[in-house]
Amino acid sequence: MKNFVSILSIFIIVSCSSGKTPVEEGLESQILHWGNGSEPQGIDPHIVTGVPEHHILIGVCEGLTITDPKGGRENLPGVAESWTLKEDQKTYVFNFNPNARWSNGDRVTPEDFVWSWQRALTPTLGSQYSEMLFYVKNAKKFYDGEINDFSEVGVKAISDYELEVELENQTPFFVGLLAHYSTWPVHKETVLKFGEMDDRSMKWTRPGNHVCNGPMKLKSWELNKKIVVEKNEFYWDADRVKLNEIHYYPIQNESTEDRMFRAGALHVTNVVPQEKCPVYLENKNPSLRIDPYMGTYYYRVNTTLPHLSDSRVRKALAMGINRKLIVEKVSKCGQKTAYSFTPPGTSEYYPDTVVEFNPEKAKELLTEAGYPDGDGFPTIEILFNTQEGHRKIAEAIQQMWKVNLGINVEIYNTDWKVYLSRQDNLDYQISRAGWIGDYQDPNTFLEIMRPGRGNNQTGWVNYEYERLVAEANKTSDQEERYKKLMEAERILIDEMPLIPIYTYVKQFQIHPDVKGWDANILDHHHPKFVYLERD
């Protein structure tokens, strides 16, 4: 809490000394002030995994394509100014923009992507998103050590301005996933200047060292206070970029962020305090935005623990949660109850799974598993990253499991980096989680629960599930594909290594000076489309 108070104090001092708030000064100088939730894990696109990191990376780096800021299904040019799909329907040729540059002025080349993808697929780097590239021919074989020569992987620079990518199978969502930061390039010379290819220290990403290719570039980073990026004069589309700087603030306390917004310290908040959302809705607060968001709020279950290894126990926990009560009385900001992992309507995919609130059935399942009325069941812990909203939901579920199942629950919060580390190492029992789609396709959800995937983080393995998802991604027939994905989703919900709670909406506050911040279900806001202007 001290950190949040100090951040707010800085704004008060600045406002008093100049007579203007940061928002007012930002309008004059095109500086956007953005509440960014947690202190980022880092900004190495091949290592990080979170939303706070994405918000910064989308400014300082760029991939072959970018998402449509208005929410369209088709991606827009990034480093690649165009691309073609060959007759085999699984080989792409990406034509590079000759003006694409790194922030030090070097040209961005197809070879940069070849090296970067090799890095992302190097097992010792430990990328949790390496599977994003497994659709490329032989990429998984290289990652698994079945082949050692990266030239056998289906990504090649076929000229100074052309990159050829051959896939294992027809993959209709491939161009879409290229807008995800895990597929973006890193500057080889800079990475190797500060370590080896697989060095996870991220020294190359520090201010003064960092080189990337986005519309902005890293200017400064004050730990737990502020990250500043500034306009990159070498960006190929720099003439379109109106913002001169973006200031990102790691504000975990929702009430503090709300006060900062109302004090004129922020243009955009990360969230809205749960207790404030219904008030703002009733008062028709013009700053409140509730946008569609392709994501699911859920609880991970560590299936490697003896008392949580039985699917009957996991289903009992799921049936002991009253989701309707949570969205109506706890989150209270337009969220929808979730009965599947994949949000209904994701690219016209509608799961038919059901997770009923049924305490009696839940008790029966616990009894079958050897825990009648919860007797003998160990006290379990719910882990969540520090945020008021997560705490309130955890407290509600703690009470529900005690009353409905007779189970004792402790709740434990920690900062973002420790929270991520504990999930990576399966050092938890039940963990708060959220998954936001990386591209517009149901595969972006179901893919992560395949065995061995870096974002599975539950220890759950089901080879029938693996077979169905793998087979779904070998066909371009959408009806057949969705049928197999639906079968996989049913297995996932029946086994319950994760417990869906609600489907997200993106609730936040935004100042009317901010333009170009269009609603889109991936919540991607590319800085070159955002600017400040008063009506």
List the predicted regions and their residue ranges:
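Gly/Pro-rich hinge or "lid" segments in bacterial periplasmic/extracellular proteins
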Residues: 69-70, 167-241, 245, 253-255, ...
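Surface-exposed binding/hinge segments that line
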Residues: 95, 114, 121, 125-193
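Extracellular/periplasmic solute-recognition and catalytic clefts
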Residues: 219-230, 247-305, 328
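Aromatic- and charge-enriched surface segment that lines or borders ligand/interaction sites
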Residues: 82-131, 164, 307
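Append "and occasionally in soluble cytosolic enzymes with long acidic Gly/Pro-rich linkers
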Residues: 230-231, 308-399, 403, 487
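N-terminal lobe/hinge region of extracytoplasmic solute-binding protein
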Residues: 35-87, 209-212
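A structural "hinge/loop" feature
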Residues: 38-55, 76-79, 106, 174-185, ...
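Detector for C-terminal structural segments
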Residues: 172, 222, 320-349, 388-398, ...
